[in-house]
Amino acid sequence: MSGLQLIWKSPTQLVLFVLLITISCIDLCHAVGAATPTKKSPPVRITKPQPVSSTTTAIPTTNEGSTTGEQLALLVSSTTEGTASSASSSSNGGSDDSSSTTAAGSLVPEICITGLQLSFTNADGEQVVRKQQELVQVIEGDVMLSVITSDPVSALFVINRVNQANLISADFEVGIRAINVDNASLAENLLIQEVQYLQQCTQYSMGIFIDFDLYKRLESIIRDLEYNVWPIPSARAHLFPKVAHLLHQMPWGEKIASVEIVTETLDIYNEFMDAARQEHMCLMHFKSDDNVYILFGNKMANHFKENGTVFAVPTERTEHIFLEELPNKSFILMENGIELRTADLDPMPTTLDEVLIGKSVLPSRILVFASPIVDLMNWLRGSLAKHCKRDEDLYMLESCFNFLNFIEDWRTPEYRRTHDTAELLSLLRMRKLSTSMLFQMYQKKQETVDVITGESRMELREIASQNFVTNVTTYYHYNRDNHTSLELKTKFGLVFNCQFTAGENRRYPFLFDGESVMFWRIKLDTWVATGLTAAILGLIATLAILVFIVVRISLGDVFEGNPVTSILLLLSLILVFCSFVPFSMEYVGEQRNSHVTFEDVHTLNTLCGVRVFIMTLVYCFVFSLLLCRAVMLASIGSEGGFLSHVNGYIQAIICVLSVFVQVGMSVQLLVVMHLASESVSCENIYYGRWLWGLLAYDFLLLCSLVSLVPFIYRSQRNYREGILIVIGAVLILIIWSVWIALSMFGDEWRDAAIPLGMQASGWAVLVGILIPRTFLIVRGIERSDIAQALPSLTSLAFAQNNQYSSEQSVYECVNPAMRHCSQEEMNHQSPSEIPTLPLRGGGPRRQQFFANLRQANANINPQRPPPHPQQSPSRSSVCSLPPSPDHSKITRF
């Protein structure tokens, strides 16, 4: 205690000590506060990369082998990396300027500093890194677009024209980042990086356009990105019609030859064949000594024969080395590259961006990219009018808010509008380019060797050209080179002309005289399996019912009504279910546009004719039989029916005449198709509107059957045949409405709807009429067995043990031979409408059995007179119907 008193002897020392403790506490609290992590606001978006100090992390390179999931995860995590690095750098903080500069620089996302990068292994096994300067060409603007394409110059030129024409009427310009893709396998990597760049490094970005083939390749990745990515329409839509037209118009003095089409993908092949179809041009492939090769793409195929003629169609920019590899006298069909010069663009003065000076563009690439861009700019201008203020004639960017919200609507293809070529050239101020937008045909001449230099020179002679805008075809050196007039040569398209192309639906236009390459097979569609299953099950059920009826008839059973009609209806259903076979078969080649011989055409027409003939006849058989039965029921019914009676002969005449009418029309159609096969095509009838004319008579029979529904639905005759026919007719009418509606959606739908509709109609008759009727027949046979097993009403034994005390007869409405009814009931019910039980037939064994039974009952007490039945006193009047005739004389309808 004395020591402490010595320490605080002086007040000055105490004050200094307290001050020292206070300063230490402040420093300690400051250090703790600095070390505690705090949540910082996310970095703001910037429009352009900002310069930072050199103390940055190493440049990350994106490997080609990295997975898509890792790159997509990078998009999620990249926005938080800047914040985390900023916090960690400030924890090591100090008061010097260099540390604060590093912290500020970390707010900029790294991709905004480094740009896009690719790291991949080349053909020599070396690791190659390509930076943004090699990949991306940029036109600066306030609102940015990106394009991933194999032809970036054409995309840059279109955006330059948009800014020069000021389509958006604003005080700012649209910028573009054009990314060159020379390898499709690298497109996925570039797309993911570009989405990340636009999200983090630009303030206003509309989306990304990508080549059509690349879009199809990356469609699943694009859906996962959930970003505005749109396909550029394929340039082949502009090129292939020009190729087909020039081939069709080309003079061709040779005989018909085999044509082999070499393409990189099946889609290219099908698109070109569709274009050739529009020109009525048949390109045939068969075994031949002379071959014509049409080569699509920029890769050379080396299997050409020496006597073959080669037509090369480059789908990208044509390289000189590709032309050198082609055989001499080959024909090259390609579009003309346009050198960009300001004076050649538009009468009004315009300028070009620096990146476009000295470059060339392709007409097809300009047109396919300009159409969606012009439509997008029109939507953007409409959005600016709603969300921006206008100063004189321009919309001010500073006053805009949410002006890019329209993109969600524009990305829907239904809202877009197409523009024709002349309109695009006028809007984008490049009207003078119309004379230079040509698709040309050249012929490679024999290479000559320069005597002085010793170098070989290749000469391309222009044969013809077609303008993209006017579609005018011009011929050049053909007359002089071939020493003959152009008009004296037969055109290529006339030599390879299509046959049997009458009508709007030309399904098989490519015909030739050669060996067939087509074969028979069952269709691979899902509906075929469904239809075959329904047809087999329906056939089994129909045969089972038919066998049952035939067996019961052979046993001597007597049915209500004539069973001949039921048997004919069952035979018609067998035809209905078997008719699915020609609809399930097809005669095809290996490809969609397989070449067809003239014999193949006759086979296809025969198959089509069989389908039409069977379809119309089986419907007619079923509807005619049902109609004649409905007419009979309506003619004898007491509840609103006709008063006359239609007997079996008239029914047969009605049915036969109804069938003969349809047979006559169907046979006439087959004769006409055979005699006029060049002008009448069964395919065009089957897939055209004439089909409804062929089915009009069947539909008339169905409508007549439905019109008799009010007159027959109460009929109880023939196992309640009236209500069963009503159910079947209504089901068939519903089925017809469904399959006719489905067949309107196209040829593929019609292929499935017609046979499935036939099977459904057969099942409607089976389920609605025949199966319930079979059940009633079985139940009636069992009741008949029970009734005939009882003792006879005339036997003495039965008479001795029974007294008639009931007011109503026990056997009333059981058999006409033993029916008692009141006079009042007779006035309200027609005898023809009273339901009866079928009588068992007179088979030998059954007749002997019941005869013995009656004889035994009669011999029990033969000397005792039969008692007289006592009538009930409460019954005022009782009447008996005359005895029923013998079962062998019963009249049925």
Curated annotation (Swiss-Prot):
Residues 773-893 are cytoplasmic. Glycans are attached at N183, N307, N328, N471, N482. Residues 50-66 have a biased composition (Polar residues). Residues 32-530 are extracellular. The keyword Signal applies. It comes from Drosophila virilis. The chain crosses the membrane at residues 531-551, 563-583, 607-627, 630-650, 653-673, 692-712, 722-742, 752-772. Residues 36-66, 82-102, 858-893 are annotated as: Disordered. It is found in: Cell membrane. The gene is boss. Its main location: membrane. It holds the Pfam family 7tm_3. This is Protein bride of sevenless. One of its GO terms (molecular function) is G protein-coupled receptor activity. GO terms for cellular component: plasma membrane. GO terms for biological process: visual perception. InterPro entries: Bride_of_7less (IPR002956), GPCR_3_C (IPR017978), mGluR (IPR050726). Keywords: Cell membrane, G-protein coupled receptor, Glycoprotein, Membrane, Receptor, Sensory transduction, Signal, Transducer, Transmembrane, Transmembrane helix, Vision. The keyword Signal applies. Residues 1-30 form the signal peptide.
